[in-house]
Amino acid sequence: RRLIGRAPYAAGCEPHEVALVNWPQNDYLEGNIIDKAPEEVAHHLEQARALSLCLFYWMQTEAPRPDGGVGFPGLYLRPDVMGTDDGLSKAPYIREARRIRARFTVTEEHVGREARGSDQAVYFKDSVGVGCYRIDLHPSTGRDNYIDVSSLPFQIPLGALIPERMENLLPACKNIGSTHISNGCYRLHPVEWNIG
């Protein structure tokens, strides 16, 4: 994803472009860091950083280019942007977080094009926001395979933000009442921003 592009800048004032790499090739699948001993968490975080650096090296030296060549040697990490010594992120991106047990749980049947057999997602009277993205699940530490399913423009129902048993607690981002499958379209940043 391009974070900073040259297009909006006047000629001669263009900054170096900045991109975020969030590809399945960069997904660390050898273990998770939830509810693990500090030593195990440190091990997995270090291995994930090593994977990121390996992918970056491949991009610089071996990635196929449109002109038939290989490698993009002009790519470099940006410690000044990321605020880290190596230019990698400060923390890993957790694609699927823990979710609340909500008063309402969004499922694939509410938003999936094929599952609905319709051109419209379910209409929620208590909608607090909208979103639109495919149901996109990357492989996981459980060795689940990649899933990419069409979804429909959907709403964020308030009931998915209200826990069953807790008071004075609202979820943020990916923590709403959704299933593993429906989380694949509710987890995207624009939808997270709508959730809060």
Functional labels for PLM-detected ranges:
Residues 1-194:
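Flavin (FAD/FMN)-binding glycine-rich loop and adjacent Rossmann-like elements that form
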